[in-house]
Regions:
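Bacterial N-terminal signal peptides that target proteins for export
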Residues: 1-8
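Short, solvent-exposed loop/hinge segments that bridge or flank secondary-structure elements
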Residues: 27-68, 100-102
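Edge beta-strand at a domain terminus
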Residues: 42-43, 48, 120-141
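Contiguous, well-ordered beta-strand patches that form the walls/edges
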Residues: 60-106, 136-137
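Short, intrinsically disordered, charge-biased short linear motifs at domain edges
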Residues: 12-17, 65-72, 78-84, 119-128
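General secretory precursor processing signal
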Residues: 12, 16, 31, 85, ...
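Sec/Tat signal peptide C-region and signal peptidase I cleavage site
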Residues: 18-22
Length: 141
């Protein structure tokens, strides 16, 4: 009876460990978003809080050049790619149109969209892009 309990316990532990390691996709939803926007009337940049409706998926990359990729929900193309896999602390670092930091143990992320203010070039309207930062949580799919 004890041997049977030990076996069942061992199998349950192995299944739980495998499930944690096997997650190939995470769905992430922003909870708070802040940044800067341009007030055209005052011709000045201001700090701003934005709607937190950002959703994206982090999944194993389909190309060999990257370990992971992040796509905004509804977009087929990755907006950020992650060259390396998760590190020992469970952190993943991705960059592209936006920068992303994700911890798979905490299931929390930090998203940064750095385009605008400093990067709007010739032909771009002042304030066309609004730099923003979001934090939120992810869940395994």
């Amino acid at each position: 009876m004890n041997a049977m309990r030990s076996t069942v316990c061992l199998l349950a532990c192995l299944a739980a460990t495998t499930a944690v390691q096997a997650a190939d996709t995470y769905l992430c939803v922003a909870e708070m978003t802040t940044g800067f926007n341009y007030d055209a009337n005052k011709k000045a940049w201001r700090s701003a809080d934005f709607r937190s409706d950002k959703k994206f998926a982090i999944s194993r990359s389909k190309t060999k050049a990257y370990a992971w990729e992040a796509k905004e929900v509804g977009d087929a193309r990755p907006a950020a790619t992650c060259e390396k896999d998760f590190n020992e602390a469970g952190n993943l670092f991705c960059s592209g149109v936006f920068d992303l930091r994700f911890n798979r143990r905490q299931l929390r992320f930090l998203y940064a969209y750095p385009i605008g203010y400093w990067s709007d070039g010739t032909g771009a309207r002042e304030g066309e892009n609004t730099p923003a930062m979001a934090i939120g949580r992810c869940r395994e799919l």
